[in-house]
């Protein structure tokens, strides 16, 4: 498979997860999913950075992304495209990817709290990769992708995540650049 096509295929597949992971930075806030409670170790379970509103909007915009992908495929790539999962397929896939991404982000926050890292503190790779791993895990049983796409996503996602964080910081959407 041509490298450019491989890159496009990987990004097209995972796009709802990327959107779901980015949206809470913009539309999040409100009640934290851990209700402000502490774990057995005395630290917060997850922290203030993961909220119900951010989770809801992350999943919603992930699904909207999948719906838009469906219509782009139909309009510009044709019904015989390898990317044509059908509308229902895109809704299910994007829901699984978005939910998996946000679950992975929550798990990353949970792990960071266990290591006494506060919200906003950097945890290299944990911050950049858990959302991708869980997005892929949630979706894989219904929508498997080849190993080369998985490997590519695991390599490029930290780079994309780091770059998007710098942009979000410059736009004053994040307090820290990492």
Swiss-Prot record:
GO CC annotations on file: plasma membrane
Membrane topology designation: Multi-pass membrane protein
Keyword Transmembrane helix tagged: yes
Protein name, UniProt field: CDP-archaeol synthase
Catalysis: reaction(s): 2,3-bis-O-(geranylgeranyl)-sn-glycerol 1-phosphate + CTP + H(+) = CDP-2,3-bis-O-(geranylgeranyl)-sn-glycerol + diphosphate
Family membership noted in the UniProt record: Belongs to the CDP-archaeol synthase family.
Cofactor: Mg(2+)
Gene Ontology annotations of biological process type: glycerophospholipid biosynthetic process
Top-rank taxon, per record: Archaea
Enzyme class: transferase
Record key words, sorted: Cell membrane, Lipid biosynthesis, Lipid metabolism, Magnesium, Membrane, Phospholipid biosynthesis, Phospholipid metabolism, Transferase, Transmembrane, Transmembrane helix
InterPro entries, per database record: CarS, CarS_archaea
Main location: membrane
Transmembrane feature ranges: 3-23, 56-76, 91-111, 131-151, 152-172
Location in or out of the cell: Cell membrane
Pathway: Membrane lipid metabolism; glycerophospholipid metabolism
Physiological role: Catalyzes the formation of CDP-2,3-bis-(O-geranylgeranyl)-sn-glycerol (CDP-archaeol) from 2,3-bis-(O-geranylgeranyl)-sn-glycerol 1-phosphate (DGGGP) and CTP. This reaction is the third ether-bond-formation step in the biosynthesis of archaeal membrane lipids.
EC number: 2.7.7.67
GO MF, one annotated term: CDP-2,3-bis-(O-geranylgeranyl)-sn-glycerol synthase activity
Keyword RNA-binding applies: no
